[in-house]
Amino acid sequence: MRYPFWRLAVFLAACVAPVWWLYQAWIFALGPDPGKVLVENFGLATLVMLLITLAMTPLQRLTGWPGWIVVRRQLGLWCFAYVVLHMTMYALFILGLDWGQLGVELVKRPYIIVGALAFLGLLALAVTSNRYSQRRLGSRWKKLHRLVYVILGLGLLHMFWIVRADLKEWALYAGIGAILLLLRVPMIARRIPRLGGAAKAGSIKVQNNG
């Protein structure tokens, strides 16, 4: 296994936020409505983790370091873990495990449907993130995993619908998402300079001038 310490560092870093939030809820440090705070925190964490996952390929192209790609699958699975926690908190604290209330919630808050579609997409990606699925699906595997772009759009729409009174934070995440998607356009991706290559070229130029 390549980069074991890097993988471990990413794993521990991804554990910090959920453990901290659950601990805060345990000691009643999340205010009068801890359930709502947990739902919001895990929802936002899912979006942030999705953006971080999508950033791995551009970072690899920019730096030439393969370690970014090595942890991409792990980050994607953490994204799924966060969304599972998000939905678990919603079921526990918002629905109170009253599934009959879900129909009422869907009518009152249709953005839940958008979030549920994003969850199903992440579920499909998580289930097929293994080598067996890659071999089994062949060329269809890449097509399926391009669903991540649709999931990002659904996640941003879900957030937009919730926070439309104050769009500053949403605009930040939407802007980052747009940049990450643009960096995957082949014509743009080919123009991404490698920092290592640029530094090496600069060094050679200095030596030649010297």
UniProtKB/Swiss-Prot annotation:
GO terms for cellular component: plasma membrane. GO terms for molecular function: electron transfer activity; FMN binding; heme binding; metal ion binding; oxidoreductase activity, acting on diphenols and related substances as donors. The chain crosses the membrane at residues 8-28, 37-57, 75-95, 110-130, 147-167, 169-189. Its cofactor is FMN; heme b. It is a multi-pass membrane protein. InterPro entries: Fe3_Rdtase_TM_dom, MsrQ-like. Keywords: Cell inner membrane, Cell membrane, Electron transport, Flavoprotein, FMN, Heme, Iron, Membrane, Metal-binding, Transmembrane, Transmembrane helix, Transport. Heterodimer of a catalytic subunit (MsrP) and a heme-binding subunit (MsrQ). Part of the MsrPQ system that repairs oxidized periplasmic proteins containing methionine sulfoxide residues (Met-O), using respiratory chain electrons. Thus protects these proteins from oxidative-stress damage caused by reactive species of oxygen and chlorine generated by the host defense mechanisms. MsrPQ is essential for the maintenance of envelope integrity under bleach stress, rescuing a wide series of structurally unrelated periplasmic proteins from methionine oxidation. Belongs to the MsrQ family. This is Protein-methionine-sulfoxide reductase heme-binding subunit MsrQ. It comes from Pseudomonas syringae pv. tomato (strain ATCC BAA-871 / DC3000). The gene is msrQ.
